[in-house]
Every structure is written in structure tokens, then in C-alpha cells.
Amino acid sequence: MDIEEFVERSIGCWRSQRSGHSLALSHFEEVRSTIDIVDLPKTDHEVKNLCDSSGVDIENAVSPFKMSWEGESDWDENEIIKGSCVLVPIPEDDNLKKGKLLRSQGYAETVSAVGEYYITEDDTFVLYTEYESAAAEEKIWFHTSNLRFRVSLIKTSDGNGVLTASFSSEIRS
């Protein structure tokens, strides 16, 4: 699998159940959400703006997409967790199995971010993103075309300590 196939397989509406452990707060959280992933053309203004602000030539972009989510947590049942971000893969030297991933909003911090991705021999998508005060590592793999799993770690900025760990199962709806 390469990044184009990974994005193509991800397009759609997913129901997600995530269990997360905050090691810093000794807290467990369960989040149920709906995730919508849609492909975007390179001509989309958000794609262009993200490439421009990241100093990346839009011609190097492949398979841009937008991810939107809405869910609720058992930690605060009155709060709706909601957001969206544009993501633009930039393969490394025509190697679609590794490169950079531009994000209009990061996973660990709500600022734009540039992560490094690669796809393993067993078709696991791995993304590592460094932020100012933390680092995020995400792994996503498909068990079937309608079932995927995601593991996420938020680490200290030096990468040695783990702040949060989560596991998600996502079913295409």
C-alpha cells in the first residue's frame, strides 16, 4: 500500500470508539465519535493555503483530504468534541510510501503541523509529528475495508516520556 491507496481506503464516514489513558493525570477516557473523511482537489483553496504556508510546491502534493469529527467523551458528557482539518501528503522523491504530511490542525496541539509518515511492509501507516511542547506518534491499519484500528501516543517534546496513549477501533458507516 502507498499513501494514495491509504487515503482512498480512508475516504468515507467512520464511527470511532477510542479509549485513552492520560498517564500524566492518571485518568481513563472513552470517546465515541463520527469521523468524515473526504478527498479534496489540489485546486481547493484550503489545500493551496496550507501548501503555501508550509513552503511546499502544490505540484508535489498527492491525495489531499479533509477530516471532520464530532463526538462525546465520558469525561465531560456535556461537551461536544468537534473539529476539522485539511491534510496534504507530500511524498519523498516520488516514493509514495514515505514523506511529509501537512496538517492545518495538529493532533497534539491545535496549530498547523508538518509530520513525517511512512507505510510499513504490513501496510501500517505511521505518522510522527513534533510540536513545540510535545510529539505525537500515530499508527493506523486496516483489518478489512470497513474496519481500521488506530494507536496514538502523545510524548514529551524530547520523545522519551509518554503523556497519553489511546486505541481506537473505527467502523465504516
From Swiss-Prot:
Name the UniProt record assigns to this protein: Chromophore lyase CpcS/CpeS 3
Enzymatic class: lyase
Function as written in the Swiss-Prot or TrEMBL entry: Covalently attaches a chromophore to Cys residue(s) of phycobiliproteins.
Alphabetized InterPro entries for the sequence: Calycin (IPR012674), CpcS/CpeS (IPR018536)
Gene Ontology molecular function terms on file: lyase activity
Gene3D superfamilies per the UniProt record, alphabetical: 2.40.128.20
UniProt-listed Enzyme Commission number(s): 4.-.-.-
Keywords: Lyase
High-level lineage: Bacteria, Bacillati, Cyanobacteriota, Cyanophyceae, Oscillatoriophycideae
Designated gene of the protein: cpcS3
Similarity annotation: Belongs to the CpcS/CpeS biliprotein lyase family.
